[in-house]
C-alpha cells in the first residue's frame, strides 16, 4: 500500500472548488437584474431527455431587466416556454416567433431579504466545505507525523500553511457573499 503524501496544492484546489461552487450557486439567485445564469437551473424536455436551457437556446440580455431566449429549433419553443413557466422563478414568458422574452420584475423588500437568507445559506455551505478540506489536510498531517513520515516541526509548519490557505478561502467566501448581498439589496 502506498504511503499517503501531503499536497498543499490539492488542498488549495479543493477549497477553490468550494468557492467556485458558491459563485455558481449565487449566480443563479434572482437579484432583480437580468442575467443569463438565472435560467441555468431550468431543464427543458427536449428530444426525449431533460437538457439544460443553454443547450437548446441562446440567452442574452438586451436590457437590464429583460432576458431574450432565442430557441434554435422552432419545434422546441413551446417546451422551453413550458419549462420557464413551471420553474420557481416566477417569470412570465412572452413568445415572438422563435424568441422568448422574459421581463424580470422588481423584487419587493421581503423577497430581497429571502434571497439574502438563501445567499447566506449557500455561503455557510461553502465555509463548511472549506473547513472539511482543512480537517482532511490536518488529519493527514497528524497521521504522517504519527507514522514518522514527517517531523513534528514539519507537521506544525504545514498545519500553519493549511490554516493560512483556509483563512484566505473563507475570506473569499465572505467577500463573494457581501458583493451578492449588495447586488440583491440594490433597488
UniProtKB/Swiss-Prot annotation:
The keyword Cytoplasm applies. Transmembrane segments: none annotated. It is found in: Cytoplasm. GO terms for cellular component: cytosol. One of its GO terms (biological process) is cytoplasmic translational termination. GO terms for molecular function: ribosomal large subunit binding. It holds the Pfam family RRF. Its main location: cytoplasm. Keywords: Cytoplasm, Protein biosynthesis. CDD domains: RRF (cd00520). Gene3D superfamilies: 3.30.1360.40, Ribosome-recycling factor (1.10.132.20). It comes from the Bacteria. PANTHER family: MITOCHONDRIAL RIBOSOME RECYCLING FACTOR PSEUDO 1 (PTHR20982:SF3), RIBOSOME RECYCLING FACTOR (PTHR20982). Responsible for the release of ribosomes from messenger RNA at the termination of protein biosynthesis. May increase the efficiency of translation by recycling ribosomes from one round of translation to another. Belongs to the RRF family. This is Ribosome-recycling factor. The lineage of its organism: Bacteria, Pseudomonadati, Pseudomonadota, Alphaproteobacteria, Hyphomicrobiales.
